[in-house]
Swiss-Prot record:
In fish, myosin MLC1 and MLC3 appear to be produced by two different genes unlike in birds and mammals, where they are produced from a single gene by alternative splicing. Keywords: Acetylation, Motor protein, Muscle protein, Myosin, Repeat. The modification N-acetylthreonine is found at residue 1. CDD domains: EFh. It comes from the Eukaryota. The keyword Flavoprotein does not apply. PANTHER family: MYOSIN LIGHT CHAIN 1, 3, MYOSIN LIGHT CHAIN 1_3, SKELETAL MUSCLE ISOFORM. This is Myosin light chain 3, skeletal muscle isoform. Gene3D superfamilies: EF-hand (1.10.238.10). InterPro entries: CALM/Myosin/TropC-like, EF-hand-dom_pair, EF_hand_dom. One of its GO terms (cellular component) is myosin II complex. GO terms for molecular function: calcium ion binding. Myosin is a hexamer of 2 heavy chains and 4 light chains.
């Protein structure tokens, strides 16, 4: 993917907002958040791999500048993206009644235990306003997630 000059300027500006020290660099452990702020949705595993599988210590202490970050962003942008249909199909497996809903409690368990595990506060934020008498309409839920 080639980004336009305007996009790169926007990316650079966003990158700068994460520079807490003022040295025009960010910590390795901020890279995933910056990518997500720029509309990407990499897994933590993807980002760790792109960073060269750094140790926990390196994640906290190593820093990189925008020129090192941009090729990483391009790499993430090129990764295959899950589609609306992919997510709906994945949730349909949990639709026991075949009525377009999944149990909220079951969805919470899935989000906290499978794949890239989410924390309780992350799940609460994601599911805010999505439960209707203990059930979640998963097509609406996927639309909600994809618009966040």
């Amino acid at each position: 993917t080639e980004f336009s000059a305007d996009q790169i300027e926007d990316f650079k500006e966003a990158f700068g907002l994460f520079d807490r020290i003022g040295d025009s660099q960010v910590a390795f452990n901020q890279v995933a958040d910056i990518m997500r702020a720029l509309g990407q949705n990499p897994t933590n595993k993807d980002v760790t791999k792109i960073l060269g599988n750094p140790s926990a210590d390196d994640m906290a202490n190593k820093r990189l500048n925008f020129d090192a970050f941009l090729p990483m962003l391009k790499e993430v942008d090129a990764l295959p993206k899950g589609t609306y249909d992919d997510y709906v199909e994945g949730l349909r497996v949990f639709d026991k009644e075949g009525n377009g809903t999944v149990m909220g409690a079951e969805l919470r368990i899935v989000l906290s235990t499978l794949g890239e595990k989410m924390t309780e506060p992350e799940i609460d934020a994601l599911m805010a306003g999505q439960e209707d008498e203990g059930s979640v309409h998963y097509e609406a839920f996927v639309k909600h997630i994809m618009s966040v």
